[in-house]
UniProtKB/Swiss-Prot annotation:
One GO term describing the cellular component: plasma membrane
Function recorded in the entry: Functions as a positive effector of cell expansion through modulation of auxin transport. Involved in thermo-responsiveness of plant architecture. Enhances plasma membrane H(+)-ATPase.
Membrane topology: Peripheral membrane protein
Source species of the chain: Arabidopsis thaliana (Mouse-ear cress)
Consequences of knocking out this gene: Reduced rosette weight and area at 22 degrees Celsius but not at 28 degrees Celsius.
Cellular localization per UniProt: Cell membrane
Keywords carried by this UniProt record: Auxin signaling pathway, Cell membrane, Developmental protein, Growth regulation, Membrane
Name of the gene this protein is made from: SAUR29
Protein name: Auxin-responsive protein SAUR29
Main location: membrane
GO biological process: auxin-activated signaling pathway; response to temperature stimulus
Inducing factors: PIF4-dependent regulation by temperature. In low thermo-responsive cultivars (e.g. Col-0), higher expression at 28 degrees Celsius than at 22 degrees Celsius in petioles but not in leaf blades. In high thermo-responsive cultivars (e.g. cv. Alst-1 and cv. Ang-0) higher expression at 28 degrees Celsius than at 22 degrees Celsius in both petioles and leaf blades.
């Protein structure tokens, strides 16, 4: 039992989720949270390095988001309206 308490305390100190209780509201330093998907209900949250903002492939996704949503994103964060597999392909190409 002490081992479990120690594990939970360590997770809390490190900022990890204990049984999924942590809210997904912030991104680590140097990263940007984006919501990806075409359906309003099936959006997935992804963390991308802020350096991607300078990449032409990622900028094309941002332009698509601007055309569809302007600056009013329904998820409260940056929403990219494309299939998740397309997003993953783009980000893997940027990674090299």
């Amino acid at each position: 039992m002490a081992l479990v308490r120690g594990f939970m305390a360590a997770k809390k100190i490190l900022g990890g989720s204990v049984a999924g209780t942590r809210k997904e509201t912030s991104a680590p330093k140097g990263f940007l949270a984006v919501y990806v998907g075409e359906s309003q209900r099936k959006k997935q949250r992804h963390l991308v390095p802020v350096s991607y903002l300078n990449q032409p492939l990622f900028q094309a996704l941002l332009i698509k988001a601007e055309e569809e949503f302007g600056f009013n994103h329904p998820m409260g964060g940056l929403t990219i309206p494309c299939p998740e597999d397309t997003f993953l392909t783009v980000t893997s190409q940027i990674q090299g």
